[in-house]
Regions:
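Extended charged low-complexity segments that act as oligomerization/scaffolding linkers
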Residues: 113-116
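A short, conserved, highly charged catalytic patch centered on acidic carboxylates
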Residues: 1-86, 90-107
Length: 117
């Protein structure tokens, strides 16, 4: 798939699952959601939404918090996966990438209620 086709398919996407599938196909990622998170590679953990406003810092922070919850599960849970170097937050219109280690003081912190949905 070329980049123009990737953009066209994303624009036509109707669900979060479709957005995820388009990214997986474009980046040639086989995915397994058995650990209850979106796409994962040892380099990148993806968190997808259908259509969020990434310019709204509260919306972006909410998606980031969900990603950090998944990173914490990777760190302390039973999944035999490494913590990826990057987090990619994406929807059908935009994406944001950040280094995972910049957030370690959050996902390693026990003072947060990590059990809340």
């Amino acid at each position: 798939m070329i980049f123009e086709e990737f953009k066209t398919k994303l624009k036509a996407a109707k669900t979060e699952e479709t957005v995820k599938a388009i990214y997986a196909r474009y980046f040639n990622i086989d995915y397994d959601t058995s650990d209850m998170h979106d796409l994962y590679t040892p380099q990148v953990l993806f968190e997808f939404k259908y259509d969020k406003n990434f310019q709204d810092l509260k919306a972006l922070a909410t998606i980031l918090a969900q990603s950090l919850y998944y990173v914490r599960r990777l760190k302390y849970g039973n999944a035999e996966k490494t913590i990826p170097y990057f987090l990619c937050l994406a929807d059908k219109n935009e994406a944001s990438i950040t280094e995972t280690n910049k957030w370690s003081s959050y996902y390693s912190n026990d003072s947060y209620n990590w059990e809340s949905p």
